Amino acid sequence: GYDAARATFARLVGAKTEDVSMMPTCAVAISQLALGLPLEAGDEIVTWDQEYPSNAYPWYVAARKAGGRVVVVPSEADLRLDTDRLIAAIGARTRVVALSWVQYQTGAVTDLARVSEACRKVGALLAVDAIQGLGVMPFDMTALGVDAVTGGTQKWLAGPMGHGFLALRPGLRDLLEPIVHGAMTYGTFDDLTDPGRSPRHDPLRFEPGSPLLFGALGGAAAIEVLLDVGIDAIHAEALRLAAKLREGLLAHGARLLSAPLGDAPSPITTFLPRGDVGAAARRLSA
């Protein structure tokens, strides 16, 4: 059922069941997080320059509304991410560090444990979009010290398109104001309107209407298969295949843009073919 599905999502990311809210998409989950936080003038949000737009626009909007600013940390020339450079950007004004665990273009992986430690020192929140790693790489938000995790089911999880989730550390939920409101935000479908009622204090605080049954149940079924196989085993096989792919690409004169597998344990492989990229694209589409 729906509650069992919520528990499965919680197992995937190392959260408590009662701290996982179902969302229509990962982008909606990020927006709820960014726009629900009580930011103030002067607050800073630290992020990477490689972020997918859905993990950038909500934070820019949140900063603009509050009178804060987004601090963008640049990648290295070879597109690697220097965690030391990111940590150096975290300071007394930092309210949130918002980043992807695994970057969508390069597969670059951020050392979340180190970033979390830096966040704790200044009282900042660590918000992680984990969509590019969940299902193929082990993840435990509690062990890593992550405050909030967003994700979706359509990538490595091999689940339905159009379903996401928001997982929070215990105690963080009530700090966030719902950005979408409905009957379930405040009570049940059977309750009459009470203008003085406060939002709920459980996961339904961010689930305003009918339950997202198809996405939640389909996503949970896919996750259960992955958990039964074992994420560690899946990761090892994915890295083996990625190494074989990269070996073949290099043999054909391609230039790899992804970090070496030993530095960034994501199988995501990005490359430029030998010669004219446009010509290669035209040949493939012919």
Regions found by a protein language model. Give the residues of each.
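Pyridoxal 5′-phosphate
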Residues: G1-A286
